[in-house]
Amino acid sequence: MSRSRWIFAMVAALSVGAACSDNPTSGSARAGTLTLRLTTPHADDGAMTFEVSGAPIDGATAVDASLRLFTRRVDGSTMVGAMAGNLANGAVVTLHVPDVGAAARYTATVLEMANRQDQLRASLAGYALTVAP
């Protein structure tokens, strides 16, 4: 085998290997899920409305079957949601996204919060939502 054919064969083999790799190159998107986590100063939260935006969102599901989630897509990269149930610190929503590498582009905001007796909180101080893999 000539040297040029051998080099061509090696380059072809490496290219095929890279194309079949589980580690995509930096320019390719990888669909998956991100987690929306709630930070709350109270132990008796029962409902909230929130907004997530920044990058495309395909859908959302509650992380726990005891939580009820309703969503409305504002546009391709903004979703408004309402969640009811015994809300506590930690994961509350799973976001289905076309590119998990874009996690840093998402922002999430608590719009309203109510206690378990359906009374709106007078202040949202201490509440936060974060989006992370």
Language-model-derived ranges and their functions:
Residues 1-21:
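Sec-dependent bacterial lipoprotein signal peptides
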Residues 20-133:
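Acidic, low-complexity intrinsically disordered segments
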